[in-house]
Structures are given as structure tokens and as C-alpha cells.
Amino acid sequence: MPIGYLCTVAFVSWGVACALTRWRWPGPFSAIPALLVNELPFIVGYLLIASTVLTLVDGDLSSPAGAGVALPALGGLAVVVYRAMLAHTALHNTGKPRRPWGRILRAPFLPGRRDVVRVRSRAYGDGPSRTLDVYHHRDKPTGVPILLHVHGGSFRSGDKAREARPLIRHLTSRRGFVCVSTNYRLQPYVTLADQVADVREAITWVRAHAAAYGGDPGSLFVAGSSAGAYLAIRAVCEGEIAVNGLICRYGYYGNLAPRDDMPPMLVIHGEKDIVAPAPDASAFVERVRTVSSRPVIYTELPGAHHNFDMFESVRSAAVNAAVEAFIARID
């Protein structure tokens, strides 16, 4: 049996194993394969099937039965897809799931849509890191809700163009929202307090300028992913900035102390997150619920790991629908 084929099977099998478990000890050697397999199971399946067919056609397998080494990995991919399908129910989404199958099956990496205009790198402060991108529908409807997204990256890395792209495409293209994705200065060159101040300034900029793109400053929601969730919460609470709601996905919450005047929250976390474990998110939600009378919706996505919003996937489509429903409910 060819070494190249065995390596492909081994690579896919390792990714499937990481996706189906919570192995923390290999660090990025488990987190990255888990992300790729969990959110791109069809692409990974294409790779495995194509490799198997080519090996058979080239006559490098003694019999078709030799391709059986790929069956456990294919079975694991089927389980991954099944668990992703459960997100729609877990999030209490109503109606028939709307999944962009064309993108999910063929082009989960494509960055944009033709009906969405991206205004790049608007400055909200001094320096190259204090910039944001504004997304609005080509027809520029007026009086629409605004979503500001704060990226993650352990406070030391990340970029405004990396995360939440499926959500931004969905809200802007299908619902006409104005969406904004912001950068902020990164550690170790600044302090955590500086980063919180950056996010606060970004919120202020959005409130002042979003109307030029059709947004309603009175309908502003702030979303954060991973470390971005932490920064978003602190920026809103410590700055006493009024927003309509907070949306946190696979967030890191550390020792955040909730306040009784926190806005309504939607918290979505991966059941198998090895970067920011789900029990930490659940504990934070309980702390919020003890002091706040505002709605706090919490969902753990079956089988989900960290960074489940980077590609067009079955799971990200369900998350998009849940965010849209939350905004409609609160707005």
C-alpha cells in the first residue's frame, strides 16, 4: 500500500479523532485538525475519497478491499456531520434550517458576496491597528440594525478579517444589516486596559458614523469571539455604553464580574472546546443570571470546538440563524 495514501488516511483519521474528542495535551496539533475536520467535513471527505480512487486507478492497491482502511475515517466524518446538524435544534431555531449548501459543499472559503460592499480599514483612532471594516448591502437600506464584531486571538493575535465572516455575510446580504469588524492593538505592546479602551472607541465610532451606511445608531449589537467576547463585555460594562445586546461565541470570560445593568446576552459555546472550556462559559452565564434581570441565552453546541464561525458550514449556518433571531427578539 502506498505511503502517500497511508499518510492521507492517517491525517484524516487523526483529525476525525480530534474532532470527536477533547484531547488537550497536543495543543495546536489537536485544536487545528479538530477545527478543520469539524467545520469542513465535506472538503476533508473529498480529499479522502479522491485519494482512495486515485490509488485504486493507479493499481497501487492489491484489491478494492484494501481501500477499507479509509472506512473508519469516513464513518467518523459522518458522525461529525450528524453532530453539526444538531446545532439547529440545540439553538432552538424555528422553521426549516436554511443552509447555504452551495457554499458549504463547494466553496466554504469564499470571502464575500456581490451584494455586500466592504469599506476597508476606516480609522477610529491613531495608529495602523485602530481600524475597522464596514460591510453594508449594495442597496444601502436605511434604519437597519448594526452589528460590531470584535475578533479573538488570545489578546496577542487575530485580525478583523478572520472570524465571523459567515455571520457578517448572512446578516448583510440576507437582512441588510450594517456590520462592522474591528481591529485593536495587540499585546505585549499594550495593556489589557488599552485594548478595552480601543474597543470602547470603536463602539463610539460606529454609533457616530454608521448612519452614513444605513445603520440605526439606536439598534447596536456588539459581538465578540474568544478573547473578543471578554473585551466586548468589559468595553460595554466599564464604559457604561448603552448597546442593545451582547453576542458571545466561544468566549473567554476569565474573572469578569457581571453587573446588574448588563444588556441582554446570547452566549454560544462549543461542547468540546479545548481552548476555552465550556464549563467556564457556563459558570460565567450563571454569574450573570444571579445579578441581571435581562435575558441571558446560553447554548452549548453538540460536538463543536473553538472557532466554529470561520467557514461556511452546517454549524455556522445554525449560529447565524440564532444570532438573527436574537437580534429580532431584542430589537
Regions found by a protein language model. Give the residues of each.
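N-terminal cap/lid segment of alpha/beta-hydrolase-fold proteins
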Residues: F29-L48, N93-T142
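Primarily recognizes the serine-hydrolase "nucleophile elbow" in alpha/beta-hydrolase
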Residues: E201-D261
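C-terminal catalytic histidine-bearing segment of alpha/beta-hydrolase fold enzymes
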Residues: P2-L20, R24, F29, N38-L48, ...
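Serine-hydrolase catalytic-loop signature spanning alpha/beta hydrolases and amidase-signature enzymes
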Residues: S154-S157, R162, C179, W205
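Short beta-strand/loop motif that positions the catalytic acidic residue
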Residues: D261, V267-H269, D273
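Short amphipathic alpha-helix adjacent to the substrate-entry channel of hydrolases
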Residues: A161-V180
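Short beta-strand element of the alpha/beta-hydrolase
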Residues: G143-G153
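Conserved alpha/beta-hydrolase "acid-adjacent" motif
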Residues: I274-A283
